[in-house]
């Protein structure tokens, strides 16, 4: 779980973010969304301190996580509707149809994920590497594929703000969701010995980098290629 959480967040920012930045010339960031990015950065730093030091995340921390998550969702739902997303895009579909599509997509994702995890476990035996390494690379890359597809679709529709929200939401969900599941299944979890020092610091640095990119609205093919190359270098390093 630890490798998947950190690896997926790193992949979302370096790989998915790199793909997102390649075709666009300008990031559309609304002022109302800046507080969301600040929340992401603050919580990423808070989570970094939980994994860099020998701190057991137990039920008390889980309750705090849930409380923060409720506040986050409440604040996000109170925001005005994005003008870039017109109601005409959803008027032609009933609410029931949309719900059915979401449920069907979730079921496909759930069962495909089970097979993917089994495949990933077999790779640990084939390559003789630790499960954490597989989690940070193969499993994390697999869990980031939906973000890649969603990002490409968002860019095609010329809605870069959706692509950014996709990365942001996925990373926040990873931190909250995976940690909460681990705590409820095992009563507590300690990431200290589950991640290398490089994994921990790269998690923090990529979170800071993502914050700087969106707040300063940085774009360009050079930045895009640099992010992707950084991810490929990190990916290769873990198997050296």
Where are these regions (language model features)?
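Hydrophobic alpha-helical segments, chiefly the membrane-spanning helices
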Residues: 1-240
């Amino acid at each position: 779980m630890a490798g998947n959480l950190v690896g997926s967040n790193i992949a979302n920012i370096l790989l998915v973010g790199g793909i997102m930045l390649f075709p666009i010339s300008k990031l559309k960031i609304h002022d109302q969304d800046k507080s969301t990015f600040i929340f992401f950065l603050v919580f990423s730093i808070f989570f970094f301190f939980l994994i860099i030091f020998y701190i057991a995340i137990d039920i008390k921390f889980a309750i705090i996580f849930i409380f923060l998550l409720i506040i986050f969702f409440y604040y996000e739902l109170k925001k005005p509707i994005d003008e870039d997303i017109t109601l005409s895009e959803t008027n032609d579909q009933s609410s029931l149809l949309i719900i059915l599509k979401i449920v069907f997509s979730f079921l496909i994702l759930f069962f495909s994920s089970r097979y993917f995890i089994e495949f990933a476990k077999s790779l640990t035996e084939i390559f003789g590497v630790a499960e954490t390494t597989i989690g940070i690379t193969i499993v994390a890359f697999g869990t980031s594929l939906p973000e890649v597809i969603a990002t490409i679709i968002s860019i095609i529709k010329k809605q870069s703000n959706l692509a950014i929200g996709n990365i942001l939401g996925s990373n926040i969900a990873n931190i909250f969701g995976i940690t909460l599941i681990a705590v409820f299944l095992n009563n507590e979890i300690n990431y200290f010995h589950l991640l290398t020092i490089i994994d921990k610091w790269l998690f923090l640095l990529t979170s800071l980098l993502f914050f700087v990119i969106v707040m300063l609205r940085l774009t360009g093919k050079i930045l895009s290629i640099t992010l992707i190359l950084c991810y490929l270098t990190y990916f290769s390093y873990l198997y050296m």
